[in-house]
């Protein structure tokens, strides 16, 4: 365990190993189990433990700190980006910009953007995740608009917080379990037909709540029941568009390339649907990039803590995007949005990053 602790953080979590291992060994599962054992035997560093237990597991504290950070970032902010940081932080923004925390998160905008539908076909509860709530709220608005356009009522449970992935990924399953219980309760109370997440990592985490809470049978059963309702945005919308006869290829126009999120493709198995949605968007022509399913190098904490390793991975992704000649790089993961938007701003400013929800929302009302 002592040797494992030295190397475990260098796993970027891309799950590429599951595709190349000839023995089909569940390497990600082994790493996750070893992380849990390491925490049980050796504990977490004090600062990390305090952050997980007192910030991530406490919605009000976590969200209050994010709101304060949106004020504190002002000296370094340029529009919606942070392009330069001082002193020892400078390396974080050398080859990529960082997204600024929004002045007004999605949860504060929701009541004004969600339409009241007379006879909705379904009731959806939207799990935004931290990044879409506080960094990319406009994309969260797009998700709501697309669902409303499908005659789906959307509600936003106020008590939702982080999905718990950053905590669980570092082996602190006790705190992750506390977070899971909070989210299960929040979404049970929403009484929705379906729960929509526009982040594949959050979707995967919700699906794993039953396993996470397996030692607490009552909560595990509740979590499994709830997890069965959780759908990833692109796969769900593609299904609904297909039913409505709206998943038809458009005449083309702007070149759009697509980056496959690691968790989207290799965990959820979703890769055809996002492409069909792009092709269905009026005025969009899909152009595939080389190695579209290779990691962008973000992987949450990894992309910040090991920026020197993350940047070469990002550069390869940027080179592949530029080679397509695309005007837009579409993504379907809020974590990848952080990395790719930042990389494009510094290395390919002529290319814009958009979540697929944004592309679809822009096309609402346009004739096919």
Language model region names:
Residues 1-2, 111:
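N-terminal [4Fe-4S]-dependent radical SAM core
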Residues 27-368:
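Iron-sulfur cluster-binding electron-transfer modules in prokaryotic oxidoreductases
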């Amino acid at each position: 365990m002592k040797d494992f602790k030295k190397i475990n953080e260098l796993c970027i979590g891309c799950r590429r190993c599951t595709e190349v291992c000839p023995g089909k060994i569940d390497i990600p599962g082994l790493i996750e189990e070893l992380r849990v054992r390491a925490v049980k035997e050796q504990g977490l560093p004090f600062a990390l433990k305090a952050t997980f237990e007192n910030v991530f597991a406490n919605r009000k504290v976590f969200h209050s700190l994010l709101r304060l950070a949106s004020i504190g970032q002002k000296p370094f902010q340029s529009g919606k980006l942070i392009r330069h940081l001082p002193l020892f932080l400078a390396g974080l923004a050398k080859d990529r910009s960082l997204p600024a925390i929004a002045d007004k998160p999605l949860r504060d905008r929701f009541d004004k953007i969600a339409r009241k539908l007379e006879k909705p076909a379904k009731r959806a509860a939207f799990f935004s995740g931290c990044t879409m709530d506080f960094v990319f709220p406009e994309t969260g608005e797009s998700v709501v608009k697309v669902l409303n356009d499908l005659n789906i009522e959307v509600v936003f449970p106020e008590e939702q917080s982080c999905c718990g992935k950053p905590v669980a990924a570092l082996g602190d399953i006790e705190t992750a379990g506390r977070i899971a219980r909070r989210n299960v309760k929040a979404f049970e109370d929403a009484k929705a037909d379906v729960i929509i997440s526009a982040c594949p990592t959050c979707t995967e985490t919700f699906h794993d709540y039953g396993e996470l809470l397996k030692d607490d049978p009552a909560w595990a059963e509740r979590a499994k029941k709830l997890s069965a309702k959780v759908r990833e945005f692109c796969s769900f919308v593609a299904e609904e568009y297909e039913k409505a006869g709206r998943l038809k290829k458009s005449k083309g126009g702007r070149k759009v390339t697509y980056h496959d999120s690691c968790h989207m493709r290799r965990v959820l198995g979703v890769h055809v649907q996002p492409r069909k949605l792009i092709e269905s968007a009026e005025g969009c022509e899909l152009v595939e990039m080389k190695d579209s399913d290779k990691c962008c190098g973000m992987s949450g904490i990894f992309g910040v803590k090991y920026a020197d390793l993350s940047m070469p991975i990002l550069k390869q992704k940027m080179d592949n995007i530029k080679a397509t000649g695309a005007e837009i790089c579409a993504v379907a993961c809020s974590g990848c949005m952080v990395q790719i938007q930042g990389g494009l701003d510094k290395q390919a400013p002529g290319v814009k990053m958009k979540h697929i929800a944004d592309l679809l929302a822009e096309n609402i009302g346009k004739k096919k």
